[in-house]
Amino acid sequence: MKGSRPEQAVLSRDTDMSKTEDTRQVIEGMVDGLNDHRIGDIGEFFAESFKWMGNQGCGTKNGLQEFQDNWQKPFQAAFSDKVCVDESRLFMGEWAAAFGRQEATHSGDFMGIAPTGKRIEIRYMDFWKVVEGKIENNWVMVDFPHVMAQLGKDCFDGHGWEAYDSGEKQAPAPEA
């Protein structure tokens, strides 16, 4: 990269490391709450002004009510018998991150795909900011293309880069 570089890690630069254990307790309690399929009282862990920022297909939820109505309810309607398994968690001051998977049964409509009854894996990454004992912000990546593939739908219509990995297609390279 030529020229000046963008400023990095602005949001977490001044984190208060003394809050690490408090953050851990909030996140661990929240994950337990999600595994218990709590919706109505999940506000125990989230600020009312909570913002949930997901990738394309997931959307952005402004406030706890939108999160409950436009994420939790449709997600639980589409996927039953689900369990969240964080494979790794990191805690740093008011910040936490995790990646893992949810294992669930496709029991309701999802992205226009009728229920299949298949047991599937939903991979994700989460980054949380906890302030005064409540989650204020949550940046989320949910691997919906992987979910759709398990349900028989290729959202890349055969143009996913997995074709490079398998040798089906030759990967392009930038011009010198």
Task: Please place each PLM-identified region on the residue numbering.
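Short, structured motif recognition centered on aromatic/hydrophobic residues
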Residues: R24-E28, W52, Q72-F75, M125-W128, ...
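A cross-kingdom feature marking solvent-exposed beta-strand/loop segments within repeated
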Residues: Q56-C58, T105-I120
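Short, solvent-exposed aromatic-acidic interface loops
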Residues: W139-M148
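A short, structured loop/turn motif at beta-sheet edges
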Residues: R89-A97, K129-E136
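A solvent-exposed, acidic/Ser-Thr-rich amphipathic alpha-helical stretch
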Residues: E21, G40-E94, R101-E103
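Beta-strand elements of well-folded, non-transmembrane domains
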Residues: N35, A104-H106, V130
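Short, surface-exposed coil-to-beta transition loops
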Residues: V83-C84, E121-M125
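Short, low-complexity N-terminal intrinsically disordered segments enriched in polar/charged residues
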Residues: K2-E48, F156-A176
